[in-house]
Amino acid sequence: MKIDQISSLTGRSAGLLTKMLEIAPLFQYAEFRKDYSSARTIPDKTTFSGSAARAENAALAKDNQVPTTSTVNLALYGREIAIDDVRKLDVNISGSPVGLQKFADRQLSSLAVKLAQEIQNHMLIGSGASNEMLGLSYFVKDAAAGGQTAALGFTTAEQAAMNAQVGLQLNTTANQDSFIETLFKALGDVPNANAILVNTNLGARLMTIAKRLGAAGETVNSFGVPVTTFNNVPIVTLPTSAIPQNESDGTNTDCTSLYIVRFAEELGVCFNTNSGFYFQDFQDYQTYPQGVARMQVFLNLVVERTDALKRLSRIRL
């Protein structure tokens, strides 16, 4: 489900979520599913032997399956604001709470945007430690198996296979063409990919290349927002705070990564949550805002197949 579908929204919380979606576009594409604060996830690591083809009256192939489970604990993200009594008591002079309500609305909008930006960043760069959720770049690091950290029921070798080191600077036509070949191959590794995640710098270069090759397009996402596409796959452009431009290839420190994702509640990439967007308003808002208003999102990353995600790292501009 999308974040607006999984959240319990009122008129005011729906308005705040709309602002979050405008500022943090990854929320428009990410899939969320309801799950417990501590839940077991089962990655699809089933193994089968032989063939399903059989002769008439012959026994069907039988494979005994043992699930590989992993516990996913939700990371807790939340902020709250309070308005000092000195502001509240202005109503004694004006006789109307309208000014205070406008001030409160502005602060709530700012708070929603701040929360959304931090969560969007951590969807990519969350370390899975120090109270942060696990982000895509920490789940699949730019490293061989020895440099990976096993997570979500996958082995370090499986995680390493989800990364491809491009090792190209996209400043010549030859390098750009070679990169596009790599990108097409990687798209083939992620069946039904529905998002290409890039930072603003690589996004601009990718569109330049795509237009030259006739692979650029445009569509409208489920929120009615126009989005550019590469070979019909939406390009989600994120800030460098989410996908850095200072990754290293061992020599240069101006590299970045691209992520091909199949967002799906089952057998894809999604985010567990038991809250969606959880908003608690000021008490007695219609009289005048007082006390504390709070916004929270409880979530964490879930990946269920190795073909749901591909990282292309060591890309220079």
Regions found by a protein language model. Give the residues of each.
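Flexible, glycine/threonine- and acidic-rich loop/arm segments that mediate assembly and lattice contacts
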Residues: M1-T251, C255-S257, R262-L317
